[in-house]
Curated annotation (Swiss-Prot):
Renumbered residue ranges of the record's region Disordered: 106-126
Alphabetized UniProt keyword annotations: Chloroplast, Plastid, Ribonucleoprotein, Ribosomal protein, RNA-binding, rRNA-binding
GO cellular component assignments: chloroplast; small ribosomal subunit
A Pfam family recorded for this sequence: Ribosom_S12_S23
Bias type Basic residues, positions: 117-126
Full protein name: Small ribosomal subunit protein uS12cz/uS12cy
Organism, scientific name: Jasminum nudiflorum
Calcium as UniProt keyword: no
Length: 126
């Protein structure tokens, strides 16, 4: 417990909340250009090859973003839209690429959860 003199000398520091996606600078999404598209392996106990892209944002930040869904057409110099949201088993990946916008096409033959993967409602067959 500090004395009154100690409190006068230096006041209590308020706890600052840490932003989870600082590269977006308060925006819901940001546009960027892919500088590298590659795969990485997740942490234990998971096993896979997750597709990620290194993206240079319009805000000037260089970030690593996850490419969700099965199959993608993203390559170097692709223009992509990036949203926040981390991938729990990939260290350092705090952003997702939005499918179905700009150069990132939606997931092919997706029937359920289509809005998250940029897929239009399929035509009904008679």
């Amino acid at each position: 417990m500090p004395t009154i003199n100690q409190l006068i000398r230096n006041t209590r520091q308020s706890i600052r909340n840490v932003k989870k996606s600082p590269a977006l600078q308060g925006c819901p999404q940001r546009r960027g250009i892919c500088t590298r598209v590659y795969t990485i392996n997740p942490k234990k106990p998971n096993s896979a090859t997750r597709k990620v892209a290194r993206v240079r944002l319009t805000s000037g930040f260089e970030i690593t973003a996850y490419i969700p869904g099965i199959g993608h057409n993203s390559q170097e110099h692709s223009s992509v839209l990036v949203r926040g949201g981390r991938v729990p088993d990939l260290p350092g990946v705090k952003y997702h690429i939005v499918r179905g916008t700009l150069d990132a096409v939606g997931v092919k033959d997706r029937q359920q959860g289509r809005s998250k993967y940029g897929v239009k409602k399929p035509k009904k067959k008679k």
